């Protein structure tokens, strides 16, 4: 199965590099690498857990309602950000049972294609070159 490069940035403002690929049927995979900020969340994650899955994202129609539902069910929600209607997000804290994968819940007023057009920052080779400097 081949993925198609959709968007990426060699040093996103959040302090990390990313490349996102889409697959037939609608699935996407986003690869993260540390950016120029040595105190960024990707660096901290790698120091604590090593390489692996950081988070899974589920897109919902109403983020505020979903966050309320999650809290009412006993989930610990953090990192809520409602400041940009193009991408609002919250995270569910992993349990204390050893799981290290975060769950991201997100809402957008844009289609995936509109996000790709808005967020495409750099060609894939520039993103990969930036990411390999941390090997």
Residue ranges and their predicted role:
Residues 90, 96-98, 117-122:
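Short terminal or interdomain "cap/linker" segment that borders an active site or interface and mediates
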Residues 6-7, 38-43:
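A short, acidic/glycine-rich surface segment
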Residues 27-38, 105-108:
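Amphipathic N-proximal alpha-helical interface segments
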Residues 17-25, 43-64:
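Vicinal oxygen chelate
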Residues 29, 42, 59, 72-84, ...:
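Phosphate-end processing signature that detects enzymes handling 5′-triphosphorylated RNA
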Residues 1-28, 65-86, 124, 130-135:
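Core segments of cupin and vicinal oxygen chelate
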Residues 103-135:
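Acidic/histidine-enriched, glycine/proline-rich intrinsically disordered or flexible terminal extensions
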Residues 21-25, 92-97:
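Active-site beta-strand termini and strand-to-loop segments that position acidic
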């Amino acid at each position: 199965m081949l993925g198609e490069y959709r968007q990426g940035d060699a040093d996103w403002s959040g302090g990390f590099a990313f490349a996102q690929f889409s697959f037939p049927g609608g699935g996407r995979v986003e690869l993260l690498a540390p950016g120029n900020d040595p105190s960024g969340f990707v660096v901290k994650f790698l120091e604590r857990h090593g390489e692996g899955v950081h988070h899974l994202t589920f897109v919902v129609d109403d983020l505020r309602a979903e966050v309320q539902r999650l809290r009412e069910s006993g989930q610990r929600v953090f990192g809520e950000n409602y400041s940009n209607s193009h991408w609002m997000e919250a995270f569910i804290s992993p349990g204390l049972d050893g799981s290290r994968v975060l769950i991201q819940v997100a809402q957008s007023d844009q289609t995936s294609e509109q996000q790709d057009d808005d967020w495409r920052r750099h060609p894939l080779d520039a993103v990969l070159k930036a990411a390999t400097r941390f090997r």
